[in-house]
Design a protein with these regions (language model features):
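Hydrophobic packing residues within well-ordered alpha-helices of enzyme cores
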Residues: 66-69, 92-96
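Divalent metal-coordination and catalytic microenvironments
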Residues: 34, 57, 82, 155, ...
Length: 204
C-alpha cells in the first residue's frame, strides 16, 4: 500500500501556465481544485465532479476559470464549496449574476462561498433554486487553520504576503489505508466506487 489517496493528481497547466491543481478520488464525485485559473485542459465531467475549490487570490490567472466551473455544475443537485480571501463572496456573486439563466427545476446547484480572514470567516450561500438573490453573509470565529475537511483529508489556509489579499493552502491526508492506483490499474480489479467503500469499511 502506498501513501497516495487519489486516482488523479494533475498540475493542469504544467509549471508555466495558470496555477491549477486538480485532485480526484477513485469512483467519487468529490474532487478538489486548488486555484481557479484557466482549466480548459480539464473535461466538463472532471469539473462536474468538484466538491470544493480553493482560490488563493483574485488575479486573472488564478480566477478566470470560475465561469467554466459554474457551467459544469449548474445542472447538478449539489453544494459546491468555494474558499478564498477577502471579497471572494462579492466577486463570485458578481460573476454568477453577470449571466442570464433559464432556472430550470433541475438546476439546483448551491455555491457555498467562504472568505477566510484573520480570526474569522464569512460564509454565504448562492442558490440557483432561489434565482441567485444577493448573498446573506454570516460571520463566524475561525482559528486560522483548518478551513475544510472530509473523511480522507483536511485543508489548512494561511494568509501570505502579496500585492492583494492572498491565501496559501496545505492539504494533509488522514492516517489510514491508501491504495496504490498504479498497481490497482494494472491488476484484475478496476478503480471505482468500491475502492472508497472498502477504505471506509477498513477504517471502522
Amino acid at each position: 500500500m502506498a501513501a497516495r489517496a487519489f486516482s488523479a493528481v494533475q498540475l493542469v497547466n504544467g509549471s508555466t501556465g495558470d496555477p491549477v491543481l486538480y485532485l480526484d478520488y477513485p469512483g467519487s464525485d468529490n474532487a478538489l481544485l486548488f486555484d481557479g485559473g484557466d482549466n480548459h485542459a480539464l473535461t466538463m465531467t472532471q469539473l462536474g465532479d468538484l466538491e470544493a475549490v480553493f482560490i488563493s487570490h483574485h488575479h486573472v490567472d488564478h480566477f478566470i476559470g470560475l465561469d467554466r466551473i459554474m457551467r459544469a455544475n449548474i445542472d447538478r443537485d449539489k453544494t459546491l464549496h468555494l474558499f478564498g480571501p477577502e471579497n471572494t463572496i462579492q466577486k463570485v456573486y458578481d460573476r454568477i449574476r453577470s449571466y442570464e439563466y433559464p432556472f430550470f427545476p433541475f438546476q439546483k446547484i448551491t455555491v457555498e462561498v467562504t472568505e477566510l480572514l484573520a480570526g474569522k470567516k464569512r460564509t454565504a450561500l448562492l442558490e440557483c433554486t432561489k434565482r441567485f438573490p444577493p448573498p446573506e453573509v454570516r460571520e463566524h470565529e475561525w482559528d486560522g487553520r483548518v478551513c475544510y475537511e472530509n473523511d480522507s483529508l483536511q485543508v489548512e489556509a494561511v494568509a501570505v504576503d502579496h500585492t492583494v489579499p492572498c491565501l496559501a493552502y496545505a492539504m494533509a491526508e488522514r492516517s489510514g489505508f491508501h491504495p496504490d492506483s498504479d498497481k490497482l490499474a494494472g491488476g484484475l480489479l478496476r478503480p471505482g466506487a468500491w475502492v472508497q467503500e472498502a477504505l471506509r469499511m477498513l477504517s471502522q
